[in-house]
A protein has these predicted regions:
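Switch II of P-loop NTPase G domains
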Residues: 121-173, 184-189
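Catalytic micro-motifs at enzyme active sites that drive phosphoryl/nucleotidyl and oxygen chemistry
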Residues: 47-49, 113-120, 128-134, 163-166, ...
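A broadly conserved sequence feature marking short terminus-proximal activation segments
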Residues: 1-15, 129-140, 300-303
């Protein structure tokens, strides 16, 4: 004997997947509940937050070779601006935007430097923040990732190795390039070569005479300036004397640039863990010149 019945179909649950949600970085379509973009591995939270705001976020890149101090600089910058009660202030958007700040400050409190940024894009820390300045009537929204230096170099040498890097740099409104001032002072040429390759890559990435990289603000930041008093006195003169290739290329191709010197650790030492190589540790934290490059970038974007 066959009984009749009504079976409810659950196909309505598939309706949200019929509409693709674009990634804010590469604009590729993704499922509405995706955590990372399936094309470039950028957080989909960026796109969801941007869709609910009237002010569209702008992108600012902080890049440099491996071990230049990029993660420490970004974490300290965010921590300082988020705690200021006057002047330029920063407000994080989303819990994921606090992860970088928390990791860096936690490591420095333990008298350690944070671990090297992994090369895998799905493990990078992204920051979406609102920046308020007394000089500007309206706040601006910024997106800043902590990209691995080795991954950046790989994309420069081998195009499309990391699509997220190419797409992000193409859309960036401003750039902060970090250069190891201690290595430059010691005569190492790798820092000069890396910066020149990167600037050449950027000029070819978007060469539009009106909106390309020749018109965008570029801050060149020498890190670890506490190890070199000459650098702190005059960063531009230091660049001209010790990195002539970088100096010449910057002046010829990038009309809106400025050199800076910054440092976070007031002094460093080495310790020898058992069974491991020497590890550099900070003896004390004395940040100086950390906010100046970022403030210059923000003011340039507001013009």
């Amino acid at each position: 004997m066959t009984k009749e019945g009504v079976l409810e179909l659950d196909s309505y649950r598939l309706l949200p997947y019929a509409v693709q949600v674009p990634c804010y970085v590469c604009e590729g379509g993704n499922a509405y509940d995706a955590e990372l973009c399936r094309h470039c591995l950028a957080p989909m939270a960026l796109g969801h937050q941007a869709a609910n705001q009237k002010i569209q976020p702008r992108m600012v890149a902080t890049i440099g070779p491996a071990a230049v101090g990029k993660t420490v600089y970004l974490g300290m910058l965010i921590d300082m601006l988020s705690r200021q009660s006057t002047g330029m202030q920063m407000l994080a958007r989303g819990a994921f935007s606090i992860r970088l700040q928390q990791g860096v400050i936690g490591a420095l409190r333990r008298c350690e430097f944070p671990q090297k940024t992994p090369n895998e894009p799905d493990r990078w820390n992204w920051v979406h923040c609102q920046v308020k300045s007394p000089e500007q009537r309206r706040p601006i929204e910024l997106i800043m990732p902590d990209m691995a230096g080795e991954a950046i170099l790989e994309e420069v040498d081998h195009a499309h190795s990391y699509p997220v890097i190419r797409m992000f740099l193409k859309k960036c409104a401003g750039l902060m390039i970090l250069i190891d001032g201690e290595k430059v002072h010691d005569g190492t040429l790798d820092q000069d070569y890396f910066a020149m390759k990167l600037l050449t890559f950027l000029s070819e990435l978007d060469d539009d005479p009106k909106t390309g990289w020749t018109k965008r603000p570029v801050a060149l930041i020498f890190t670890k300036s506490d190890q070199c008093p000459e650098l702190e006195e005059n960063p531009a003169a230091f660049a001209q004397a010790h990195t002539p290739g970088l100096w010449q290329q910057t002046c010829e191709r990038f009309h809106h640039h400025k050199f800076f010197a910054t440092g976070v650790a007031g002094g460093t030492a080495f310790r020898q863990p058992r069974g491991q190589g020497r590890v550099r540790i900070p003896l004390r934290i004395e940040p100086h010149g950390v906010t100046a490059p970022f403030e210059w970038i923000v003011r340039s974007l507001g013009k």
